[in-house]
C-alpha cells in the first residue's frame, strides 16, 4: 500500500483557481486512479531512473476493500508554496496478484516510433503472449521479465529523434478531417487494454505532458513540461474529480456487464461510445494522445460549466469550493447514482490544450459501472471527439453546445442547468448506444431543418402572393426626405418581391441602378450613346417581361383592393353595430351627444376609406406614369441617336456614290478602238471597259467634300477637281482638257456661296443643319454634273464635225490609203505567223533545237515531189504514143506541164 503524501498540498494549491499544471522533475506523473483517495491498493512507486510508462495488467481484479470517504474539506485555499515529491505512478488492481507486477528494466527495451498495437482484446483474457529468446527459453511477454538489450548511446539518440519525428507526423495525420482515429471506441476494449510503449528517457517523457483526472486526495506534480512541437501553450488544468461512493459488489457487477456489452458491440461491428470507468482510465490517455490536435488553439476549446452539488459528483480541482458544499457532497452524489439522471460534464483541458477525457459520459461514477446501455451515452467535447464522429455530427446542434452556449451555461444556476440537460440532451443522448443510433439521432435534426426551410419557403411564397399595402408610400416618403439614392433593406425586399407593382420589373430600384431615376434633361448627368444603348436594352427586356403577366397582375391587384375595401367596411360596420348596441348605456345628455358624434365619425370614416382607396390608386397610377416617362425618355433619346447616325451614314454613302461616279466618268475617255460614243452609251458600258483605278488615288482626296463634324467647313466639292485631273490617266484627251477651265470657273462661281453657307452653320452636330446642307450640296452637284455632261457632248459633236471635214478633204488620196491598208494587212499576217512560231517555241522548246533539220527535211520532200511529178507526166505521154499507132497527141506544152498529163490521158479514153 502506498500513501499519497501530497494530497493536502494538492488541494491547497489547486484551490486557488490557477489554470496551470504544476510539475516537478523532468517527467509528467501519470495518475491512474480508481480506488480510495488516501490509499490505493495494488500499486508500486517507481523512481525517476525508470521513467517508463506503466504496465497495465490484462485481467484486473476488483479491489477487495471498501472505499473510504473523501479527503477533509475545510482547507486553506491561499497556500502558495507547494512542495513536490518525486514522480509516482499509481496503479489499480490487487497487490497480491502476480499480474500487477511491472517490468524492472523498461528503459532497455527497443523503441518503436508508433504505439504498440495488439489485438489482445480480440482474444480470451486468460491467453498470454509468448516468445522465445536466443537461448531457447520461452518468455511470457505479458508477465515475465524481458531480457536486456544492449543499445549504444548513438542508437538511443537516433531512436529519440525518430520518436519525436513520428509523433509529429502522426499528430498531423490524425488531425486531418475525416480521419478515423485508431483509438476509436470500437477498437480498444475497456476490459483488455493494449500495452504501451515505455518511454525511452526522461527527455521523451517530458514531451508527453498529459494530465488525467485525479482524485482529490492525490497529487499531480511535475516540472514545467515542455509541450509538443506545434502544440499550443498550456491553457490550464481543469481535471474534474469523480467522487467514488460505491462498494465492491457494484464494481464487480459493472465489470461483468461492461465485458458483455463490449463483446456484443464488437461482434456486431458497431462503434460504441463508452463512459470512462475507474479501472480503465489509462485508455483515456491513449485516446487523448491519438486525438491530440496540435492546430487547436486553447481559446477555441470551450470550458465546461462549473460543477457543484448538482453536477453529477464532479468537482474541478482549480475552482475553490466552500466548506459546507464539500462536506455535504456525498448526499447529492448518492441521489444521482440511484436515480441515474444523465447530467452534462464539461470538457476538461490538459496541459497541451487537449481534453484529457476522450469520452465525457453522461452517467456519473456514482452509478454502477455497467449501467446498461444508458451509461454509454456521452457528450463528446469538440476537441476530444474522434474524427469519424466529428465528421458525422456537424448537424447535431442541440447535442453539442458551442462556446457561447457553454459560457452562458456556466453562469446559470446548477439546478437550471440540470433541468436543461435532463430535458434535452439527456432525453436524446442517453438513448444512443452506437453509431447507428447516433445517425438515427442526427436524422431528426436534419428533418427539422428541412421542415423549417419548407415553412420559410411557404411563408415567402405567401408574402409574394399577398404582398404589403401600398409599398410605394415609404419609397415616396424617402424621396421627399432627400435620400433618393439610399434604400432601406425593407424597401428593396418589397420591390424585389413585386407582388402588387403594376410594372414590377421596371421599378425605382432598376431606374436608380440605370441612373435614370431623375429627368434626363435636368439634373441627371448626360449619358453617353453606349450607356443609353445599354439602358434601352434592359428597359426593353423589362417591358417585354411585364407584358406577359400584365393581365393576371391587374386582376390580382383589383381583387386585393376589393377585399381590402370590403374588410374596411366590415370593420366599420361592426364598430358601428357595437356602438349602437350600447345605446342603452348612454343615459346622460352629454353621453348622447358623444354617441351621435361617434356615429358621424363612423360615416366620415366610410367616406374617407372609399376616397383613400381611389386616391391611392390614382397615386399609384401617377407614380407609374412618372416611372414610365423616365424610361420612355431614355428610349426616345436612343431612337434620336439611331436616327442621327442613320442620316449621317446615309449622307456619307450618297457622297461616296457620287465620287465613284465622277471618277468613273473622268477616267472613261474615248474608246480604245477610236470610235466615239455618246453619253448614253458611255453610261451603259461603264462597268464593262472601265479601267481599274486604285481607291487611294481617286477617292481619298474626296473625303472632305461633305462637312462632317470635326472637319473644316471651307472644303467644297469643286476645288478638288484639279486633283482629279492630275491623278487621271496619262492619256490626255483634248476635249477633257479643254473642258476643265470652264468647270473650274463654274466651281469658283458656284462654290463660293456654298462655302459661305457651310461656314455659317454653327454646330455640325445639329441634325437639321446637316440635312439642309446635304440637300443643298446634292442639288449643286447635280447641276454641276449636268453642266459637265453637256460640255462633253458639245465637244464630242465638234470633234465629229471636224473628223467629217477631214475625211472629205482627204477623199482624193483614197488609192494610197488602200495600198497602205493592204500593206498593213500583210504586216498583220506576218506578225501572225511570227506569233505562231513564237507560240510553237514556247509550247515545244525542243522543237527549236532541231529547226534546221526540219527545214532540210521539208526541202527534200519538196524536191522529191517535183521529180516524181515530172517523171509521171513523161511516162503518160510515151504510153499514149505507143497506143495510138504512132500518132502523138501530146503537145510540147503538155509535155512540159506534168500536172496536165492526167487530164490529157482521160480525154482519148472518152473518145
Curated annotation (Swiss-Prot):
Stretches for region Interaction with ITPR1: 534-580
Tissue distribution: Highly expressed in trachea, aorta and uterus.
Pfam families for the chain: MRVI1
Residues where Phosphoserine is found: 118, 393, 683, 696
Annotated consequence of substituting residue 177 to A: Drastic decrease of PRKG1 binding
Subunit structure of this chain's protein: Interacts with PRKG1/cGKI-beta and ITPR1/IP3R type I. Part of cGMP kinase signaling complex at least composed of ACTA2/alpha-actin, CNN1/calponin H1, PLN/phospholamban, PRKG1 and ITPR1. Interacts with HCN4; regulates HCN4 channel activity.
Name of this chain's protein: Inositol 1,4,5-triphosphate receptor associated 1
Organism from which the protein derives: Bos taurus
